[in-house]
Amino acid sequence: MPLSSHSERLMGTTITISLADERADSLLQKSFDLLKELEYRFNANSQKSELMEINHQAGIAPVKVHPDLFELISLGLEHSLAPSSHLNISIGPLIQTWRIGFSDAKVAQPQEIESVLPLINPHSIELDSSVSTVFLKHKGMKIDLGCLAKGYSADKVAQFLREEGVTSALINLGGNILTIGKNQSRDNQPWQIGIQDPANPRGNHLMTIPVVNQSVVTSGIYERHLTVDGKDYHHIFDSQTGYPVETELASLTIISDKSVDGEIWTTRLFGERPASILWQVESLEGIEAILIDKEGHLSCSSGIPTL
C-alpha cells in the first residue's frame, strides 16, 4: 500500500507524518490535531501555553496542570537531577537570554549570564503529584521542555496511531524520527533512516540504518547556531557556565524504542567525551548510539551493526 503524507510547521520545525492506511486522511488530521494540542501545552515561547502559566507564577503560587504536562515535567526533573546529567529543564532563563534559533538571537553578556545562573536550579522545582501542581520557588525561574517535548509528542502520536490499528508509519518531527512497523510502500522492508553528515547540508548522510518500531533522535551543534565576529555559538548550553557546551562532538544520535528516551539521552550525554558516552550507552538497555565528532569521525555502540 502506498504511503499518504502530510506536513505542517509546528513546534518550531517542519513535521511530516507518513502512513499506510485506507483512513489516512482522517488519521493524519487527528494526528496533527493532537500535535497542536501538545504544542499549546508545552511551548516555552508562547505566552498563552500551559507551560508558560507555570513560568508566570514562578515565586508566586503552584499551578495545577494537565496530566501530560505533569508527566513530562516529572520525567524531565528526574533526569535533570541525575548525577552528571547535562539535561536541565530549569534552563529556560538561559535559553531566553541567548535566543539562539530565533530571529533575535544574540551573544549574551557576562553580566546577563551571571544574573540568570542562580535561577537554573532543578532542585527549586516543586511537584505535588496528589494535586498535579508545579511550583517554581523563585521569581524569574523558567522551565523549558524543548529538549523533551518533540520526543514525547511523537510517542503520543504513535500511541494514537497504534490504537487505531496503523501498522506502517513514519513520524518525522524535524529530524526526530519514530517508526511504526515496516515500510509497506517498499515491499514491507525496514525503514531506512539516514544519519546526517554534520559538515554538509541537510539530506547528506554518512550512513543509513534499518529501523523497525524504533526512534532515531539526533542532537547536533550544526542544527541551530549563531555566528558573530567569526565565532560560532551553538544552541546546546552548559547550565553550569551559561555558555554553549564545549564538546568534541558534532552530533549524537540515539536509537531507542521511545522517542522521548532518545531526547533524554542525547541531552543528558551531550558534552561528555565520546568514550564516556559509548561506555554509558552500553549499560543502558534498549539504547544505541552513533557519534560523529568535529573531524567527521564516526563511532557506534555495539548494537548498531545488528539493527
Task: Specify the residue positions occupied by each region the protein language model found.
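Mature catalytic core of soluble alpha/beta enzymes
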Residues: 1-307
